Amino acid sequence: METGQQFLMLKNSININSKLSFHLFNDGFFFNSNSESNYFLFEDINLSIENELLNFLKFNDINNSNEPKIVFFDSPSMFIPSKLHDHKNSKQFLSNYTGLKSNHKVVFDITDDEKICVIYQLNKEIEKTLTKSFTKLNFKHYTTILYNNLKEYSKSNSDSIMKLFVNLQKDKFDLFLIKNQNLIAYNSFPQSNADDFMYYLFALIEQYKLSENSFDLLFLDRIEVFENYYSTIKNFHDKIIFLEKEEALKVNNDHPSPYFLNII
């Protein structure tokens, strides 16, 4: 049952706003600048090879005085309360959650509210070439950005209703369960169709014993390619909200995580 679409504004005050950014995925990267906005495969432009990166930057008229934002999508992250996190144990924490990749190192972000350490893996070769190419860099995992944005949204929408936020991506999706501005749960699940999405979504709903009227379900954006997902969930839950921004939605089917097109 659907009570009618609701559209709310997601504050964008803490978003990555620089025009220059690299979004790193397993098979390639999405590059955004004043002159270029496209997805490139590593087999065509390998960022871990210094000459290839330098030629690419030269072609796009980018020099080392720029400060690009490097956003990592190529490995999962783990959320640890800051008060429980010892940076010396980051590798051990993460190894209990996901397999550690060769030629990667374990790093972490601190969320803006300083409550969460986001632990993840970073490709050392790509870090090396980027560091040589720019004087200053800003590294961040995409889930850190999501958390910061959702906490900012929660500040202006501080009712006591539990909120389950959904970030749909090409082959996975993220769930953030938040109540009274506090993170209750975060997880990321694989998906290739609406059935996968529904399975994992309701598994989390059942795990936290959420009754139908006890929470709002909020999608970060309304993306055309996921319309059948929205239609399916509307048959089971009536508190559905789409977070829309003032800016027009950018459409680029090559970006594996469409929400991030709106904040680059």
Language-model features and meaning:
Residues 1-264:
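Hydrophobic/aromatic-enriched cytosolic interaction surfaces used to assemble or bind macromolecules
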